[in-house]
Amino acid sequence: MSTNRHASRAQSRQAALQVLYSVDVGRRAAELPSSEAIDEALASVAAHFELPDGAHAYARELSIGVARNREAIDRVLADHATNWRIERMAAVDRNVLRLAAFEMGWSGVPASVAIDEAVELARRFGADPSPAFVNGVLDAVARTLEARGEGRGESGLP
């Protein structure tokens, strides 16, 4: 992957995290964000940060994908986040985990790439313990997907 594409993808992930965080903290817990809410949040993010060509589309794809599959993603994360309920996690950590789990399970992104990018987002936006927490949970998810022969977008998370 070229450096420009990597930078664009990294910026897309950052924008998607900001969108997911925004719609997560601005809604009731049981309410799934709509495509319209995601588009509004993405427009707000794009108004404040310059996104390179293609980054906006990938950020939207990630945000919509996480929103549409949030319940399944949250079940998988809950199974792998020992002693942590999803709703009790820090909002940044919760959405970094959702984003990476979606990439591993539905987008065909290799687990190692999704985990590395998620740890970097946690380092940048989370609290001091966030990178280690995110790495541990996602490593467990990746091992489960690998054991099932999944994780390259063929079947998604259960």
Predicted regions and their residues:
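N-terminal interaction/assembly modules
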Residues: 1-158
